[in-house]
């Protein structure tokens, strides 16, 4: 089975305490949103303490055009991608020796917070010594599900090409999409929740033998689920001044009524019950989302501790977030024969599930 050999994450330079983010939001929306003080409680109740951003807080005190925001997205997404790829291919926590970019057969680039044609992966190829025959697979529009979907597509590629080495790179700069003149509740909730980040994994096919320092998660199976007529649950409303967040409060209820039965079915098809999972690697979409996972899949709160800790330290970074969670399992938790389920939700409305088993 294809294995995840190495992983890395990249933290943007500007760290903001949640209390300071609340004060900035209060300043920007003062006398513009009715009952603002009541809505600002989401900053205190979301289980987030710090978040990291690609721009300083004062950047949001002035208006920026869609063109300016997107230009900055292209510049920084390229920069962060280069950094996180280099870190993944040289990660001494997992690899005995570095792997050259020239050895990579495909790159799956995942993002939803900016637009670039050619896609960011092409720009990265001009900065690192990849082969000019590298297969590029950009994925756009999957939002928070993008990290798990990238793992799934790397699995598909490596099943078809067992000698392949594939990078999955996720970069999201959610702060560049913040709209200071959008006074909707969705925008306010987004301001309390979303952050910036980047992550990269290296997935290798069955015929690639790399001696690693730790046991590695093999990908046993993947699954996808889509909900018809659900475009309004989560996504972007694209307007002249940029991307406006769509974010419905029904997501935890959807986990209970729609996702839970699918996950049980997916696991049963692999001969596993949810109680048999050693690790639950959930995208922490929010505190209520994690609680819905626990209730629906009959998990103890201990099973979501790492996801909750990533949410506390980083907020919701969209697609890279579930890989931040996976990194902690790969560094500190995974032992040979452990079984894990990686799950994320995103626009569509959709879910991605990946079943993992740690191997020597």
Question: What residue spans do the PLM features occupy?
Answer:
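Short coil/turn connectors at secondary-structure junctions
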Residues: 1-2, 102-105, 132-135, 161-166, ...
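Short beta-strand segments
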Residues: 6-8, 110, 140, 165-172, ...
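Active-site-adjacent elements of ketosynthase-type condensing enzymes
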Residues: 116-122, 168-189, 221-239, 286-295, ...
């Amino acid at each position: 089975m294809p294995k995840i050999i190495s992983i890395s994450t990249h933290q943007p330079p500007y760290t903001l305490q949640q209390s300071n983010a609340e004060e900035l939001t209060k300043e920007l929306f003062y006398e513009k949103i009715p009952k603002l003080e009541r809505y600002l409680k989401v900053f205190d109740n979301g289980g987030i303490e710090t978040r990291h951003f690609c721009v300083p807080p004062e950047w949001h005190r002035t208006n920026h055009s869609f063109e300016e925001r997107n230009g900055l997205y292209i510049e920084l997404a390229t920069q962060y991608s280069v950094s996180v790829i280099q870190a993944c291919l040289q990660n001494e926590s997992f690899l005995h020796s570095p792997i050259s970019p020239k050895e990579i057969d495909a790159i799956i680039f995942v993002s939803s917070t900016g637009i670039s044609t050619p896609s960011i992966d092409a720009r990265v190829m001009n900065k690192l010594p990849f082969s000019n025959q590298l297969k590029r697979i950009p994925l756009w529009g999957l939002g928070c599900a993008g990290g798990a979907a990238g793992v799934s597509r790397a699995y598909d590629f490596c099943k078809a090409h067992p000698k392949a080495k594939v990078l999955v790179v996720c970069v999201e700069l959610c702060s560049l999409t913040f709209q200071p003149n959008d006074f909707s509740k969705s925008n306010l909730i987004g301001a309390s929740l979303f952050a910036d980040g980047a992550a990269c994994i290296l997935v290798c096919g069955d015929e690639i033998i790399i001696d690693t320092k730790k046991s590695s998660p093999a990908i046993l199976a993947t699954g996808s689920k889509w909900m018809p007529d659900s475009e309004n649950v989560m996504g972007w409303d694209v307007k002249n001044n940029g991307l406006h967040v769509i974010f419905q409060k029904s997501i935890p209820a959807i986990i209970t009524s729609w996702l839970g039965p699918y996950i049980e079915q997916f696991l049963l098809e692999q001969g596993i019950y949810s109680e048999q999972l050693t690790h639950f690697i959930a995208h922490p979409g929010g505190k209520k989302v994690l609680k819905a996972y626990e209730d629906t899949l009959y998990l103890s709160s201990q099973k979501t501790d790492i996801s909750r800790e990533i949410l506390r330290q980083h907020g919701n970074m969209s697609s890279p977030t579930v890989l931040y969670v996976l990194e902690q399992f790969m560094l500190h938790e995974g032992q040979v024969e452990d079984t894990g389920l990686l799950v994320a939700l995103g626009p569509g409305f959709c879910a991605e599930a990946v079943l993992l088993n740690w191997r020597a």
